[in-house]
């Protein structure tokens, strides 16, 4: 190569390098706006408890699409429905961030909510949809009505234990739907073991729970030298045994022809279509229970708080129940279409206090440009569900308040809130990752609300002087993913003289748990 040609070659390399570097820097300069972070840790120290409130406040300054650097990990926070829909409904944003301990080790990659976007997830999702879709969930209505009756009876008998009664109802309802198990107490060994699993999994998935999430090379450490790894592997073996035992008990009943409708039975009967092994089906059924029980009890708890804070909404729902159902019988799903305000109350409960106010995170698998902003591949994306559900542009200036009527039209029938999605809220998530059990959740909440408001009045508890006990409306308990209200007391009384007798009579017909 001559001196001249070498010079031209060197010049070409410099020009190409300049163009590439400029392009890369240009892309990163177009990152969405966000707060300045600290060296090394970036914005990590700014992401503390009640992140949804932090994101809402920062959104006032930085807008609907914000960028955070979390110790080198790009984090994109979304504060509007349009942006969330535009991004999270697309395949390239349907992955989940990798969680080495919670997903890879403790659940063997088979916990569907954490599973990466790929063929294994698609098979599990298809099987879950087959067992929980809108056209099949009506077979679970008798279970939901039965549990609602038991809850009404328990609240009338022991109102001071309402939290325990609500948690039992949620756990028993979902256990019956998933595994065809009869109503049980909250202390039932199966429920207790699965609840313990959910607690362990949630703690393992919390940011900062394990150093290996930030230093993946630690995964190569042999188990005998890494207690965190031994523990996770041990729990995977024990939890696999637990879920397989529950699943095989249903499989035995299916073989005998003695089973009732259940999600596990649907998996067994459709095994040839979706190609999952018994081990995979066992974990899928376990995941559906884990996701459903805690979120349902949290939603019921927020609704109880709303009834104390907004007595006019309670009275309007009761008036509708009196008109449609009367006082001689209990409400049923046959009344569903004729109770638009009660159904609106379901939607409003899930909008007003989403049990997961920041949603499960998504992950981008490719670079993307949105509205001129660069979103790098591998970014974690979070939708600020709390703020989106309270956006005044969609829900009005009173979006902070509980008002089921916002979901009704001028004739009192259910209507689509302008600018929102099908559910009139985004608490079930987005796109391919939308909650597959949302129809069960809606129906369970409908049964509970209709039954309780037919039978009882819910009021604030009083002190010895007759004054209402104070409530911490803004406080909450963060159980990992699920958020529930701080403990509070309620006053529960029969709504009319015959109500308690009718509930007790129905409970006797249903049997005890």
From Swiss-Prot:
Melleolide sesquiterpene aryl esters are cytotoxic secondary products with anti-cancer potential. Armillaridin shows therapeutic and radiosensitizing effects on human esophageal cancer cells. Armillaridin induces autophagy-associated cell death in human chronic myelogenous leukemia as well as of hepatocellular carcinoma cells. Armillaridin can also inhibit the differentiation and activation of human macrophages and thus might have potential to be developed as a biological response modifier for inflammatory diseases. One of its GO terms (cellular component) is membrane. It is found in: Membrane. This is Cytochrome P450 monooxygenase ARMGADRAFT_1018418. Armillaria species are both devastating forest pathogens and some of the largest and oldest terrestrial organisms on Earth. They forage for hosts and achieve immense colony sizes via rhizomorphs, root-like multicellular structures of clonal dispersal. One genetic Armillaria gallica individual localized in Michigan's Upper Peninsula stands out as exceptionally large, covering hundreds of tree root systems over approximately 75 hectares of the forest floor. Based on observed growth rates of the fungus, the minimum age of this large individual can be estimated as 2500 years. It comes from Armillaria gallica (Bulbous honey fungus). It comes from the Eukaryota. The chain crosses the membrane at residues 1-21. It is a single-pass membrane protein. It is an enzyme of class 1 (oxidoreductase). Pathway: Secondary metabolite biosynthesis. Gene3D superfamilies: Cytochrome P450. Heme binds at residue 435. Belongs to the cytochrome P450 family. One of its GO terms (molecular function) is iron ion binding. Keywords: Glycoprotein, Heme, Iron, Membrane, Metal-binding, Monooxygenase, Oxidoreductase, Transmembrane, Transmembrane helix. Cytochrome P450 monooxygenase, part of the gene cluster that mediates the biosynthesis of melleolides, a range of antifungal and phytotoxic polyketide derivatives composed of an orsellinic acid (OA) moiety esterified to various sesquiterpene alcohols. The first step in melleolides biosynthesis is performed by the delta(6)-protoilludene synthase PRO1 which catalyzes the cyclization of farnesyl diphosphate to protoilludene. The orsellinic acid synthase armB produces OA by condensing acetyl-CoA with 3 malonyl-CoA units in a three-round chain elongation reaction folowed by a C2-C7 ring closure. Pfam families: p450. The lineage of its organism: Eukaryota, Fungi, Dikarya, Basidiomycota, Agaricomycotina. Glycans are attached at residue 442.
């Amino acid at each position: 190569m001559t001196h001249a040609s070498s010079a031209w070659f060197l010049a070409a390399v410099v020009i190409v390098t300049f163009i590439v570097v400029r392009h890369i820097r240009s892309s990163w300069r177009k990152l969405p706006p966000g707060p300045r972070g600290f060296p090394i840790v970036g914005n990590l120290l700014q992401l503390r408890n009640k992140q949804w409130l932090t994101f809402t406040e920062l959104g006032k300054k930085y807008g609907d699409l914000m960028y955070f650097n979390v110790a080198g990990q790009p984090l994109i926070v979304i504060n509007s429905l349009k942006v969330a829909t535009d991004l999270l409904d697309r395949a390239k944003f349907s992955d989940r961030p990798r969680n080495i301990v919670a997903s890879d080790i403790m659940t063997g990659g088979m916990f569907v909510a954490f599973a990466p976007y790929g063929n294994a997830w698609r098979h599990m999702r298809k099987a879950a949809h087959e067992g929980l879709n809108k056209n099949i969930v009506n077979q679970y209505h008798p279970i939901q009505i039965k549990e609602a009756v038991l809850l009404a009876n328990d609240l009338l008998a022991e109102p001071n234990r309402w939290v325990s009664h609500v948690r039992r109802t949620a756990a028993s309802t979902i256990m019956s739907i998933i595994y065809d198990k009869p109503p049980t107490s909250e202390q039932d060994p199966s429920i207790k073991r699965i609840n313990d699993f959910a607690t362990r999994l949630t703690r393992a998935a919390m940011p900062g729970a394990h150093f290996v999430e930030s230093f993946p090379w630690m995964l190569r450490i042999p188990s005998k030298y890494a207690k965190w790894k031994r523990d996770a592997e041990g729990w995977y073996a024990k939890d696999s045994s637990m879920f397989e035992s529950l699943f095989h008990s249903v499989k035995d009943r299916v073989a005998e022809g003695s089973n009732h409708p259940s999600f596990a039975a649907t998996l067994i009967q459709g095994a040839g279509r979706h190609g999952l092994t018994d081990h995979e089906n066992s974990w899928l059924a376990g995941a559906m229970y884990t996701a459903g029980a805690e979120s349902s009890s949290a939603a019921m708890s927020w609704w109880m708080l709303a009834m104390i804070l907004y007595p006019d909404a309670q009275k309007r729902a009761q008036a509708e129940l009196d008109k449609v159902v009367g006082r001689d019988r209990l409400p049923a799903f046959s009344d569903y279409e004729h109770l638009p305000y009660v159904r609106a109350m379901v939607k409003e409960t899930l909008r007003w206090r989403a049990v997961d106010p920041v949603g499960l995170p998504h992950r981008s698998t490719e670079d993307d440009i949105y509205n001129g902003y660069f979103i790098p591949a591998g970014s974690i994306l979070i939708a600020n569900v709390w703020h989106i559900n309270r956006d005044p542009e969609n829900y009005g200036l009173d979006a902070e308040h509980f008002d089921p009527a916002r979901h009704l039209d001028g004739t009192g029938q259910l209507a689509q809130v302008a600018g929102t999605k099908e559910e009139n809220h985004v608490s079930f998530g987005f796109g391919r990752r939308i909650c597959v059990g949302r129809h069960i959740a809606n129906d369970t909440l409908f049964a509970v609300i209709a039954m309780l408001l037919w039978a009882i009045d819910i009021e604030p508890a009083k002190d010895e002087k007759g004054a209402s006990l104070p409530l911490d409306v803004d406080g909450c308990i963060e159980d990992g993913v699920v958020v529930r209200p701080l403990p509070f007391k309620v006053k529960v009384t029969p709504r009319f003289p015959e109500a308690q007798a009718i509930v007790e009579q129905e409970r006797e017909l249903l049997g005890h748990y």
